[in-house]
Amino acid sequence: NIRKSIVLGYGWNNIEVAKISNNYNLKKSKLFPERIIPFCSINPNWGNKAMQELERCLREGARGIGELHPTNQFLDLKNKKILEPMMTLARSEKIPVTIHGSEPVGHKYPGKGKSSPKELFDFIELFPDNIIILAHWGGGLLFYELMKEVKKISENVFYDTATTSFLYEPKIFKIANELVGSKKIIFGTDYPLVSSQRILNEMKELTQEDIKNITYKNVTSIFNS
């Protein structure tokens, strides 16, 4: 059973729509504080308005930023000037930033985007001290952690498992555990697109300790950092 969930917003382009989404998540988290942890959805391209919205969300209980969707939000992950205010605040508040990852190969699907492992790595290089969660296994960036320089720069990077069922064979859990370890993997679903039980079923070959790390220990550690 899922006792508590992190609820993310979408990568919105319209700030008024983002506010509606953020308000909904914040409201529900106050009604069900033992069940919901809200994140705040912004677009750094909004400049000061983005920062004002982020600061408001943090005051009202948001515990992270995301999901950012670089393709849909026309966000250049190498534009440090645009990204730095958000990342500086996130770093000072010790909150994670969640970014959509896109596989550079394979089938197309709605929302896939073009935030490839290369773009995500460039972003991480700019902000290595930030806590960063790469959605959908970072589009495969975790496989490059076999390279020493990628592993070193990705010390504060986590990979979430959202939509695993649509992207990879279940054995990715075992392979990812061997590559980066269960302490760098965070349980995600993209619910209701994929159910939590379906993802959990695909983790059955892992040890109970690894499953505990992925499902709750890692995020607990992030929030207590």
What name fits each language-model region?
Residues 29-33, 58, 124-125, 150-151, ...:
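N-terminal cationic-hydrophobic initiation segments that often serve targeting/anchoring roles
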Residues 42, 46, 165, 191-192:
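Structured beta->alpha junctions
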Residues 25, 57, 65, 90, ...:
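Conserved, mostly hydrophobic/aromatic
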